[in-house]
């Protein structure tokens, strides 16, 4: 369990009024802020704090979402037939806009190779 504390009394003056997160499970303390002697984010053993008195402070945490690999999703709401028709008859679709790599782009402004790539990537039979 993680407990937030503010040190109110300590043998080490650098610890006075500093804020820490205590990890009872691992016997560690992470510095949130201190006037001097400790860096923000520094992790020390709980014993390294020595004799201290403290008051608990509420800790709010937001869930951390970690996505590795830079994943993203482009949503295009249309049919394969519409895109294939736009390749063959671009004059019928002058305003057809799609999402590619996070950008909105006119389908007709893409090269034929890029248009085929979009159709292939957008409409797959299976993963």
Swiss-Prot record:
Name of the protein: Autonomous glycyl radical cofactor
GO CC, any one term: cytosol
NCBIfam families linked: spare_glycyl
Organism: Proteus mirabilis (strain HI4320)
Summary of the function given for this chain in its UniProt record: Acts as a radical domain for damaged PFL and possibly other radical proteins.
Family matches, as InterPro entries: Auton_GlycylRad_Cofactor, Form_AcTrfase_GR_CS, Gly_radical, Glycyl_radical_cofactor_GrcA
Residue list for modification Glycine radical: 102
Keyword terms, alphabetized: Organic radical
The UniProt record lists the keyword DNA-binding: no
Domain Glycine radical: 5-127
Entry GO MF terms: formate C-acetyltransferase activity
């Amino acid at each position: 369990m993680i407990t937030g504390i503010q040190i109110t009394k300590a043998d080490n003056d650098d610890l006075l009024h500093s804020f820490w997160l205590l990890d009872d499970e691992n016997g560690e303390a992470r510095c949130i802020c201190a006037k001097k002697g400790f860096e923000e984010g520094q992790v020390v053993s709980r014993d390294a704090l020595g004799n201290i008195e403290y008051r608990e402070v509420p800790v709010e945490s937001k869930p951390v979402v970690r996505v590795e690999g830079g994943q993203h999703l482009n949503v295009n709401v249309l049919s394969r037939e519409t895109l294939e028709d736009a390749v063959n008859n671009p004059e019928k679709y002058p305003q057809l806009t799609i999402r590619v790599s996070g950008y909105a782009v006119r389908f007709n402004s893409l090269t034929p190779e890029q248009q085929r790539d979009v159709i292939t990537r957008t409409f797959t039979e299976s993963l």
